[in-house]
């Protein structure tokens, strides 16, 4: 049994919890805090000295020691963190609201990796007194739940940071057709700047957050592209929208000051409003009046430069230079890709992390936030991007990935190479490594079998065996994945479906146009019922995965999507049966020529593409209509 000296009672209690994840042999470890290296471990023959600079770094040191002792008796390790703060932000606004138990599990793993901060992105998924439509049927956290999560983070000397929205990205709230909500709206998902009831709402946001001990908050304000162009324009006429942003920011910062908060905000809108073509990554000319405002505000807010796409250090460096025109107080947010369907993309996350880390170090950035977004339904599992999180931890503490696999196996029980096989549904054989967002995992699954509008973006002769092999690989890994086995079981079933579905629309059309009624009958009576059975099983596995990680709210969207898919397969069966029986003389859906879904990669020599909006994948008809 391992023996520690120099621990506080709280640290001893936390280490007991972490023994559920890692194991240490019978050794003696003398622990002390030091102002030298972030982590230092020395010793041999069962006697070790461990020092840490910041309290949260003790738990990474524990993991690093466990890894070293599994390989040998003599240990001499020193690590120096490049970043004062390393955070993970979980998206709890795209239907998947991390449940409290899973938040605690995530905190434990992050502690072992060396993270200082745990963040939850909550657009409307926290409760505000006097705002019943805010988070209505969305699984909004109560103040007590947030306090419980924060207390658990503090147990491991981690900071909890809420990430909210105080301008845009509030579509789930402002959609409600009641006066008390609509009077707050400018256009689309954007609040009406200058409306006093808007600032009452924002005061209520901070009143809820003030029940926490943390006094650090991200106030959002990103992607408000149409700010000032809806009701604001009708009420006030044309104004300089960069100045309008500054005016709103000042009001929000005043409210934050009232409650004692220091704010961060996503930085993109300043650049989009001041660049010639409205893009984030362009040179900007700052109008003088806006410059005066920014100079007054810049010491009150940290700008977060977010970028999840660049594959070269210089692209990041250029954007850092642009940011420094506005402020020197800059944090960086990179991405752990879990927002392109059911399947993560840890491979691309690794590629961009390597380049972003170089630029962050070169620009003396002191805070890095790794974001786990969940666009269009939060369908990717919360824990599927653990490799991406370990990658950023290694880059922070070591500036290399030489010990990535060893440290990851200590923390999860599985090699990082095996864990990253979760990506397989996105890793088609002919795809370049440096392209983001290509997501066959999603569009092959959701597209219709009679109206397969993405068929031009599939290459069945290579895709079908790829998915079949992926299903086998993932099933094998599941057997050794321990507490993470459910991730591999779900992905294995998904890949089995993709293998059967990727050529189905094409084969139906070929048989129909060839007059091959025997093949049509075989598909209608055997293959389609089998596919429905596979999808029903996947829905069951996915539901278990969702409920293990998240609150139940938001699962209804997946029920609707998969239920619709199943009904469309039934419709295909009946349409084909009617044709085969002579009840109809043609199948109109099969008479339509298939066109490219988009031309994003039209100049490339592969077929796959990006399609991440369910309502455009599932049908060419209109779902959102008046």
Annotated model-derived regions:
Residues 2, 15-53:
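Short, well-ordered secondary-structure micro-motifs within conserved domains or adaptor modules
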Residues 2-25, 108, 148-151, 157, ...:
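Substrate-binding groove of N-acetylhexosamine-processing glycoside hydrolases
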Residues 5-6, 31-33, 43, 52, ...:
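Pocket-edge structural micro-motifs
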Residues 7-10, 37-39, 98, 141:
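Alpha-helical hairpin
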């Amino acid at each position: 049994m391992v023996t520690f000296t120099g621990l506080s009672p709280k640290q001893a209690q936390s280490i007991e919890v972490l023994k559920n994840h890692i194991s240490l042999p019978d050794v003696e470890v003398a622990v002390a805090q030091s102002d030298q290296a972030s982590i230092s471990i020395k010793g041999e023959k069962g006697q070790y000295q461990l020092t840490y600079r910041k309290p949260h770094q003790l738990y990474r040191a524990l993991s690093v020691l466990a890894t070293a002792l599994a390989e040998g008796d003599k240990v001499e390790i020193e690590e120096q963190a490049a970043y004062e703060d390393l955070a993970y932000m979980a998206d709890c606004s795209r239907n998947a609201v991390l449940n409290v138990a899973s938040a605690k599990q995530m905190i434990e793993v992050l502690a072992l990796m060396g993270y200082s901060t745990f963040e939850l992105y909550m657009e409307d998924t926290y409760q505000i007194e006097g705002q019943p439509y805010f988070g209505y049927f969305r699984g909004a956290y109560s103040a007590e739940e947030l306090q419980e999560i924060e207390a658990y983070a503090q147990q491991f000397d981690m900071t909890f940071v809420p990430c909210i929205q105080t301008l845009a990205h509030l579509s789930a709230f402002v959609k409600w057709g009641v006066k008390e909500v609509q009077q707050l709206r400018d256009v689309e998902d954007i609040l009406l700047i200058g409306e006093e009831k808007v600032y009452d709402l924002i005061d209520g946001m901070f009143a809820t957050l003030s029940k926490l001990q943390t006094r650090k908050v991200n106030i959002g304000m990103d992607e408000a592209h149409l700010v000032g162009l809806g009701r604001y324009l009708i009420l006030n006429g044309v104004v300089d929208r960069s100045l309008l942003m500054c005016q709103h920011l000042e009001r929000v910062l005043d409210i934050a000051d009232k409650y004692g908060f220091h704010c961060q905000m996503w930085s993109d809108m300043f650049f989009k409003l001041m660049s010639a073509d409205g893009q984030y990554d362009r040179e900007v000319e700052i109008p003088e009046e806006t410059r005066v405002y920014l100079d007054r505000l810049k010491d009150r807010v940290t700008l977060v430069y977010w970028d999840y796409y660049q594959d070269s250090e210089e692209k990041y460096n250029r954007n850092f230079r642009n940011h420094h025109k506005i402020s020197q107080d800059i944090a960086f947010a990179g991405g752990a890709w879990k927002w392109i369907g059911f399947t993560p993309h840890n491979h691309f996350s690794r590629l961009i992390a390597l380049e972003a880390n170089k630029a962050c170090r070169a620009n003396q950035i002191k805070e890095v936030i790794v974001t786990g977004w969940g666009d269009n339904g939060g369908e990717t599992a919360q824990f599927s991007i653990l490799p991406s999180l370990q990658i950023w931890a290694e880059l922070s503490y070591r500036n290399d990935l030489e010990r990535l696999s060893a440290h990851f196996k200590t923390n999860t029980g599985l090699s990082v190479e095996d864990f990253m096989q979760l990506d397989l549904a996105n890793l088609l054989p002919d795809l370049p490594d440096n392209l983001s967002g290509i997501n066959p995992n999603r569009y092959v699954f959701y597209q219709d079998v009679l109206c397969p509008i993405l068929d031009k973006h599939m290459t069945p002769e290579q895709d079908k065996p790829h998915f079949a092999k992926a299903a086998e690989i993932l099933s094998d890994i599941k057997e050794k994945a321990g507490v993470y086995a459910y991730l591999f079981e779900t992905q294995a079933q998904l890949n089995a479906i993709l293998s059967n579905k990727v050529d189905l629309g094409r084969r139906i059309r070929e048989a129909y146009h060839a007059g091959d009624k025997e093949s049509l009958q075989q598909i209608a009576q055997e293959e389609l019922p089998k596919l429905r059975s596979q999808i029903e099983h996947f829905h069951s596995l996915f539901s278990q995965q969702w409920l293990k990680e998240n609150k139940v709210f938001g699962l209804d969207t997946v029920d609707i999507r998969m239920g619709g898919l199943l009904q469309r397969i039934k419709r295909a069966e009946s349409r084909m049966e009617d044709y085969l029986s002579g009840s109809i003389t043609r199948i109109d859906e099969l008479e339509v020529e298939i066109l490219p879904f988009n031309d994003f990669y039209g100049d490339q020599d592969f077929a796959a593409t990006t399609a991440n909006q369910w309502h455009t994948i599932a049908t060419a008809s209109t779902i959102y209509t008046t």
